[in-house]
């Protein structure tokens, strides 16, 4: 259906290690839980070393109106999307020369952590020299599954228009959804996991001119599968309050992954007459350490097949939908690739839902 040719990323300026984040959580939650020390162990045991935020950590101690937070979301998302797209279209590791903006036929913009109408990609088109005829497809509300879903929908677009070049932008500022007055355990655990991140991926159809690509081997998306678990709205998502986005985050997510995901993956692989042993790498959205452990246990994978997911979790935490693009970029730059080997891209999100993509390594140019 489509090739992934490049990924560009942009990270906010404020880097926070887990020790500092745990101190912040103690300050915010110490009077709400008698077992605060036990709960704070999740910061140390979660295999996250650092995360990045759009504001200094002290800023989050005070309450801010939804209006203020959403205005910051628009400004910061636009700034970082611009940087990620520029890198994506001109990354010297991926291209011999930059891809012209006018060559991009469609832009898929994915987010779940703020609101903007016109949507961010429209604002971006006023700042970068895209053609005014570029198709815009904003995708909102898929949470952590959004990046994989954006790639899948973009690949399907390329199947219909095989000469097209298409951008997928995923921008999540999870930190701006933090509500200091929310003293629930879900909010505390979320404080140990989520960070901010923005990324852009360039895809092209099978008949597109890829001669400028430097990739010896590129992931060619062959198929995608979306699955919804019915009656599971309470697993993850948002409640909307006067203060903005209030996190819904079930403690049962790792168990659901372990019990539910394997069947979905098996059905997807059976469709292509493949087995788990045929999959050389799983480029997964790393929801957290327990989710990665559930992937390994449920799918019978070695930790090596999830090394990029583990690496990104350590460096950046859970950046919601943007995370999967960071994982793919890490593997493009550092991972093992062999022609014709198969791999999976996967993510889970609100619904409760899963998005899976099957790819093979094919000649990039």
Curated annotation (Swiss-Prot):
Q: Which residues form the active site?
A: 144
Q: What is its EC number?
A: 2.3.1.74
User: Cross-referenced SUPFAM superfamilies, in alphabetical order?
Assistant: Thiolase-like
Q: What residue stretch is flagged as signal peptide?
A: none
Enumerate the catalysed reactions. Answer: (E)-4-coumaroyl-CoA + 3 malonyl-CoA + 3 H(+) = 2',4,4',6'-tetrahydroxychalcone + 3 CO2 + 4 CoA
* Pfam families, A to Z: Chal_sti_synt_C, Chal_sti_synt_N
What name goes with this protein? Answer: Putative chalcone synthase
According to its UniProt entry, this protein's organism is Bacillus subtilis (strain 168)
The encoding gene: bcsA
